[in-house]
Each structure stands twice: as C-alpha cells, then as structure tokens.
C-alpha cells in the first residue's frame, strides 16, 4: 500500500460511473422506444444494467468505509457537502416542473379553453388516493426519524423495526401511485395537463423508488452491524433524501392535486 500523508480517500479506477452512464442511456432510450414502438427490450436491459451497477457500487462503498476505514472525518465532511449539493440540484430539478405547471395553469391559453384544468380533462379527486398517499409519506417521515433516534441511542431492535416500516410505507406509496396511473382518466399525451402531471408525479415516484432502495441497503447494513451511533452517514444521507421526497410531495399535492383540480 502506498503511504499517504493526508486523511482523504484516493479512489482506485472504477468502472461503475461508466456502466451507470450506460444504464442511464439505455433506460432513457428504452423509454422512448417503449412510448413510440411499444418495445420494452432496451428499457429492461437498461434497468438490469442499472441494478447491477448499484449493487456493485454500493458493495465497493461499504467495503471502503466499513472494512477498510477510508471514510475518515474529512471524507465524511466531504460526503455531507456532496449530499447537500445533490439535494439542492434536485430542488432545482423539480422547480422546473412546477414552473411548467404554474406557467400553464395561471394563464391558460385559448387552446386550453381559457381555463384550468383544460377542456376535456377530468382531474383526480385530491381527497381520495392522493390524500392517502400524503398520509403514507408523512407517516414514513415519522418512522425514519424514529429509526434515526433509535440508531443514535444504540437501540438496534427499534432502529430495524422503524426502518422496515419506512421501507414498507415507501413500497405501499409506489403501489398506490401505480394504481392511480392505471385508473387515471387522462394520459401523458393529453396536452400540457397530462404531460406536466405525469412528468412531475412520475419523477417524484421514481425518487420514492430510489429512496426505498437506498433505505433497503441501509437496512442490510444495520442487520450486518455496519452502523454505530457515531458512524452512520450512509443512513443519514438516506434520511435526508427521504425527507426531501416528503417535502416535494407536499408541494406537489397542494399545487397539482388540490389547487390544480
């Protein structure tokens, strides 16, 4: 091993950024193929490549942090800054979709019938499945906070229980959202309303799936005794991400489901 006189982690060459970029290309191209030609081969290939990349990359990070001790305090500080900047970029990502929605709804054009929702669109009832989804996500925010406090108090059993509850609530939210999509009286091709609705709620749903995956990895780490009350940034980052997803949903519910209907 080469001696280094600093506390920073010098990463070895890794193929996972390249395979991750390849999987992103395959998935986006696969989505276009699915929308236009009803072919899912490319999309499924991209999803498989993405799943394999996530598994290998998370395995490497766990090995470097838990077994090799590369995540020193300066490295953890850098990871915190990185996660904060990542969530900030996500805020601006969703801001673009909200901008598109409000731009179209506050001054509807004659082509939309001069009012919002546009002529011919029957919006979803905000007091049915969307309200249940809101309750589910708020409950998951409580349970992940419970898990965090249990971890800091070295209460292993309660941490596992609370984290498992959070993951199950995330899966339940995803299933409810999928059922809502199937039963929706409009599609993504139904003008500006359909496109902004499905793009915004769809990307939020994707973030819930990513967050649920992130928390599942944290659960496996906790079961393998990787976390301590002082060293658990992986879980902390997942909790930040989950709270961000919660807040985005509240804005989404108030804007698109309640006000927009």
Swiss-Prot record:
Keywords: Membrane, Mitochondrion, Mitochondrion inner membrane, Translocase, Transmembrane, Transmembrane helix. Its EC number is 7.1.1.9. The chain crosses the membrane at residues 16-34, 41-66, 73-105, 129-152, 156-183, 191-223, 233-256. PROSITE patterns: COX3. It is found in: Mitochondrion inner membrane. Belongs to the cytochrome c oxidase subunit 3 family. Component of the cytochrome c oxidase (complex IV, CIV), a multisubunit enzyme composed of 14 subunits. The complex is composed of a catalytic core of 3 subunits MT-CO1, MT-CO2 and MT-CO3, encoded in the mitochondrial DNA, and 11 supernumerary subunits COX4I, COX5A, COX5B, COX6A, COX6B, COX6C, COX7A, COX7B, COX7C, COX8 and NDUFA4, which are encoded in the nuclear genome. This is Cytochrome c oxidase subunit 3. It comes from Pongo pygmaeus (Bornean orangutan).
């Amino acid at each position: 091993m080469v001696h280094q006189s600093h506390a920073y982690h010098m990463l070895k060459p890794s193929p996972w950024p390249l395979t991750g970029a390849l999987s992103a290309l395959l998935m986006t191209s696969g989505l276009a193929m699915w929308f236009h030609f009803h072919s899912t081969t490319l999309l499924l290939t991209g999803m498989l490549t993405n799943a394999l990349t996530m598994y290998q990359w998370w395995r490497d990070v766990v090995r470097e942090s838990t077994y090799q001790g590369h995540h020193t305090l300066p490295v953890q500080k850098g990871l915190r800054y990185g996660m904060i900047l990542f969530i900030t970029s996500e805020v601006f990502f969703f801001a673009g979709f909200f901008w598109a929605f409000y731009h179209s709804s506050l001054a509807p054009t004659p082509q939309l019938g001069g009012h919002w929702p546009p002529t011919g669109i029957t919006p979803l009832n905000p007091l049915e499945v969307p309200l249940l989804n809101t309750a589910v996500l708020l409950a998951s925010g409580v349970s992940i906070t419970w898990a965090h406090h249990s971890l800091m108090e070295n209460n292993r059993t309660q941490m596992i229980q609370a984290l498992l509850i959070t993951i199950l609530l995330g899966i339940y939210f995803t299933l409810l959202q999928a059922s809502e999509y199937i039963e929706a009286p409009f599609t993504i091709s139904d003008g500006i309303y359909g496109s902004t609705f499905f793009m915004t709620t769809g990307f939020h749903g994707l973030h819930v799936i990513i967050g649920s995956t992130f928390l599942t990895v944290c659960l496996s780490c906790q079961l393998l005794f990787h976390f301590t009350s002082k060293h658990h940034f992986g879980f902390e980052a997942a909790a930040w991400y989950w709270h961000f997803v919660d807040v985005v949903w509240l804005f989404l519910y108030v804007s698109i489901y309640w006000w927009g209907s």
